[in-house]
């Protein structure tokens, strides 16, 4: 279990695990965040925590798809719900920028602004799944476009594609690309490419 880093003790001793699963829905992620803000607030009171408390302190595994992946990545890195709400309120319009009518045959939103915001938020190449910045496990659900099966990607060091010896190891993929791939529902944004 050496790949767990500073989280190793937490995952060896905590039972049962607490999992937070977040759905997609584009800019409606703001609604999800409003609900999470209330959960975070109530947990602070119930657990007698101060303002440094984050949902990643409570949930062992945070996962999501599409806009849920954006939120899950932020929470897993220890961002407060309020910071993510501010992020959606300031960047939401740019992230979900509709494309010119004639291009809607392929996709509904322009992914350029989204990609720019994801790079700014999750780093261009400095944050990936082997990065020690995570406060909880993260699961991002994407799909393989050519065959359509779901592709769950996690920072769990016991995950199948977490072995650095594998040519298809997920550890080398920057976080912003993983999140972008999850937002690539076939029509809203077009496909995301992992490098």
Residue ranges of model-derived segments:
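Terminal, contiguous helix-loop blocks that mediate binding/assembly
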Residues: 3, 10, 57, 186, ...
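Surface-exposed acidic, glycine-flexible loop patches that form ligand/cofactor-binding
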Residues: 6-12, 50-56, 123-136
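Patatin-like phospholipase
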Residues: 4, 16-21, 27-121, 154-165, ...
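Intrinsically disordered, low-complexity regions enriched in proline, serine, glycine
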Residues: 84, 129-131, 191
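Short, glycine/charge-rich beta-strand/loop segments that flank catalytic centers
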Residues: 104-106, 133-138
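Active-site gating loop/helix substructures
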Residues: 96-97, 135-195
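A short catalytic or substrate-binding loop motif that flags glycine-/basic-rich loops and adjacent residues
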Residues: 13, 23-26, 131-134, 143-145
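Active-site periphery "cap/insert" segments of enzyme catalytic domains
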Residues: 112-135, 148-152
């Amino acid at each position: 279990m050496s790949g767990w880093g500073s989280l190793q003790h937490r995952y060896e001793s905590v039972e049962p695990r607490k999992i937070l699963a977040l759905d997609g829905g584009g800019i409606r992620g703001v609604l999800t965040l409003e609900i999470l803000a209330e959960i975070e607030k109530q947990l602070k009171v119930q657990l007698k925590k101060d303002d440094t408390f984050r949902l990643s302190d409570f949930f062992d595994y945070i996962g999501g798809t599409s806009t849920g992946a954006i939120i899950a990545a932020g929470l897993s890195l220890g961002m407060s719900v309020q910071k993510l709400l501010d992020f959606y309120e300031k960047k939401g319009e740019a992230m979900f920028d509709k494309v010119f009518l004639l291009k809607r045959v392929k996709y509904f939103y322009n992914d350029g602004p989204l990609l720019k915001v994801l790079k700014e938020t999750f780093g261009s190449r400095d944050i990936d799944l082997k990065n020690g910045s995570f406060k909880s496990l993260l699961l991002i659900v994407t799909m393989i476009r050519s065959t359509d099966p779901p592709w769950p990607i996690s920072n769990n060091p016991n995950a199948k594609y977490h072995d650095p010896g594998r040519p298809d190891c997920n550890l080398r993929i920057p976080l912003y690309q993983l999140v972008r791939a999850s937002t690539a529902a076939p029509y809203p944004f077009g496909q995301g490419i992992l490098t």
